[in-house]
UniProtKB/Swiss-Prot annotation:
Its main location: cytoplasm. Keywords: Acyltransferase, Cytoplasm, Iron, Metal-binding, Transferase, tRNA processing. Fe cation binds at residues 114, 118, 302. Binds 1 Fe(2+) ion per subunit. Signal peptide: none annotated. Its EC number is 2.3.1.234. It catalyses: L-threonylcarbamoyladenylate + adenosine(37) in tRNA = N(6)-L-threonylcarbamoyladenosine(37) in tRNA + AMP + H(+). Gene3D superfamilies: 3.30.420.40. SUPFAM superfamilies: Actin-like ATPase domain. This is tRNA N6-adenosine threonylcarbamoyltransferase. One of its GO terms (cellular component) is cytoplasm. Substrate binds at residues 136-140, 169, 182, 186, 275.
Length: 336
């Protein structure tokens, strides 16, 4: 039986990535060209800067991925690409490169939802058992997704305002931490105590929606008022208190979802899934009857490896796109 190879491209935000997947589950290469250093001085991602960086490095990423995988273009069976959600300019660069490569090598094109990629990064750990629930937590999204079968996603809960990763970066900026702030806040939180009271929005309500804008505002107000009064705040305790509130909200809504949708598997994925505090709370708060699957740290952030793992499922369903495929920056899963 011939080996199957899928080349995947990811460029939805500030990472340019090209990966190659063998036989639906073995990642032979996952090249990531990060732009974090370029955006640090701005305190966040600048779309125009991101697009320019993608243009500069995407061709090299293709070459490096093929070389690392030890294959040539003629060995490939398909090309997959993120077509949304994300920054429209950034998406278009990756899509143009993927479509040109697919056309030149007469390969089918597989369209992949970026968030499906995050979710299916869990396939790197084990083959998933359906139905399952997923908590997707990143800089742009916070959502609970019910997955009835391979490639069948439905949103059952999501944030009404800020995404959890966005809240981390905004409070990090207030504290003068380096962008992206999530990892540093997590590290500082482990050295502090939950001594400042922050709100846990809608934590007792039965619905599965999240809200982090009130928590973010409460944090900013506390910090501002302390500055005005010349009061000293303990940075480690601030981080510990903020993170405790975030995790209380995430865990409460996830547990409610598990009661409403009695599944045996919970996937937790996205950039914030790298958070050590979140991983610790999942280990202590989620029933041992639930199989909690979290992608390895190397697949939590944006990368093409996760896009390839999601694309393998779409390949089986023969979900191919024409070369007229356009970017969908606001692409979302279907809601219930």
């Amino acid at each position: 039986m011939k080996d199957r190879y899928i080349l995947a491209v990811e460029s939805s935000c500030d990472e340019t990535s090209v990966a190659i997947l063998k036989n639906d589950k073995e990642l032979l290469a996952n090249i990531i060209a990060s732009q974090v250093e370029s955006h640090k001085r701005f305190g966040g991602v600048v779309p125009e800067v991101a697009s320019r960086h993608h243009v500069e490095v995407v061709t090299t990423c293709f070459e490096d991925a093929l070389q690392e995988a030890g294959i040539v273009a003629s060995d490939l069976d398909a090309v997959a690409v993120t077509y949304g959600p994300g920054l429209v300019g950034a998406l278009l660069v990756g899509m143009a490169a993927a479509k040109a490569f697919a056309w030149a090598n007469k390969l089918p094109l597989i369209p992949v939802n970026h968030m499906a990629g995050h979710l299916m990064a869990a396939r790197d750990v084990k083959e998933l058992q359906y139905p399952l629930l997923a908590l997707l937590v990143s800089g742009g999204h916070t959502e609970l997704v019910y997955v009835s079968g391979p490639g069948d996603y439905k949103i059952v809960g999501e944030t009404r305002d800020d995404a959890v990763g966005e809240a981390y970066d905004k409070v990090g900026r207030v504290m003068g931490l380096t962008y992206p702030a999530g990892r540093e806040i997590d590290q500082l939180a482990h050295k502090g105590q939950d001594t400042y009271h922050f709100p846990r929005a809608m934590i007792k309500e039965d619905h599965l929606e999240f809200s982090f804008s009130g928590l973010k505002s409460a944090f900013i107000n506390l910090h501002h008022n302390a500055e005005q009064k010349g009061e000293a705040l303990v940075l480690e305790d601030l981080c510990a208190s903020f993170q405790a509130a975030v995790l209380d909200i995430l865990l409460a809504k996830t547990q409610k979802a598990l009661l409403k949708y009695p599944v045996k598997t919970l996937v937790v994925a996205g950039g914030v899934a790298a958070n050590q505090g979140l991983r610790e709370r999942l280990a202590t708060d989620i029933s041992p009857d639930i199989d909690v699957v979290i992608p390895p740290l190397r697949l939590c952030g944006d990368n093409a490896g996760m896009i390839a793992l999601a694309a393998a499922i779409e390949f089986e369903k023969e979900n191919f796109a024409s070369l007229k495929l356009n970017a969908k920056p606001s692409l979302a899963f279907e809601g219930l």
